[in-house]
Amino acid sequence: DQYLTNSAKIFGVKKEYIYTVLKKYYDGFVFSFDSDKTLYNPWSVLNFLERPNNGFKNYWYQSGGTPSLIMQYFKVKDDFDFLNYKNREKYFNLNQLQYKYEITNIPTEILLYQAGYFTAIKETNNIAKLITPNEEVEESLLDLYYNNEFKCRVWNR
């Protein structure tokens, strides 16, 4: 509570506002299909509370979201439209999300789900919708896209 009070004081806002922004940036991970509870990225929350003067920074890559595998994957696969992923809803059978795929034939959205870039929201008994869990992860995913797109253009000249 003292850390939240300190953060609110630094920003000149009420603690409730800090809670709201923490949720927007760092919450949203779902780890059980049978629960509507979401989890915060603890690394990001701890880093923010330790240094609120830095603002709501992106700590995703520091928390294990390092994109090496994803970047390598996108060098050989180009079936995922980063710019439009947010505008289309993708639904998968829960068994598909838990299946152990070979890296050569895993659907892109499921790879991103298994790597933590998407979280699954259960829609019906066996169907889940994949979404980005929060702004921190969404920003990281877009960063991957822009870096990958730029590199592809440079390599293909």
Q: Where are each of the predicted segments found?
A:
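Extended alpha-helical interface modules used as scaffolds for assembling large macromolecular complexes
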Residues: 40-157
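Amphipathic alpha-helical segments of the small helical/lid subdomains adjacent to P-loop NTPase cores
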Residues: 1-48, 82
